[in-house]
Amino acid sequence: VNSYFVIDDDSMAPLQNAVGDITVIPNETIEKQEVEFNKGEPFVITGKNAYKYLKARNETSTNASLLRLERQIDYLKKYSAKAISKTKNDLSFPVKLYNKVVNNVTTDINVSKVTFLASCILKEKENVNLDFVQIKGEQIKGEGSYAEFYPDETALFEMVLDIFYSETV
């Protein structure tokens, strides 16, 4: 790991507000939490509800954390697309984002690295698509009411090789 960037709960609203509202189509219905949304119905994520939407899960379902992860990945794809679009229009946008949250994050990334990473993304000629990968495996209800995830060891090993290993000739 070359760098790390851990976002505190307090950073979600400023980051969301900076890119503007994002409309998502939830993959499940959540009604009993601090935020309510319905499966298949458009839901607008704002600074006020971003953290709650990303945190919410149906605690009665064994697959609750997997469904939440799917929502989080969908959100991250839409968020990054908006952030990249804003960066193409304003090259200082990534630094502005960084400055909004630098006091509420844990990171070893500085402004120089933010600028470098943004320039790497903008070098792409076509639309930039960030890849998100998910570890294959099985989720079961464990002791008590906790869900337990067991990765497919072979698939995990192959994924690590695909992502981090390149054969030199």
Regions found by a protein language model. Give the residues of each.
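Flexible, polar/acidic helix-loop-strand segments at domain edges
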Residues: 11-100
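A general secondary-structure junction signal
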Residues: 8, 28, 134-136
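Second-shell loop/turn segments in exported
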Residues: 1-3, 58-67, 83-88, 100-108, ...
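A short linear-motif detector with a strong N-terminal bias
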Residues: 2-4, 31-33, 109-114
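C-terminal solvent-exposed extensions
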Residues: 45, 106-169
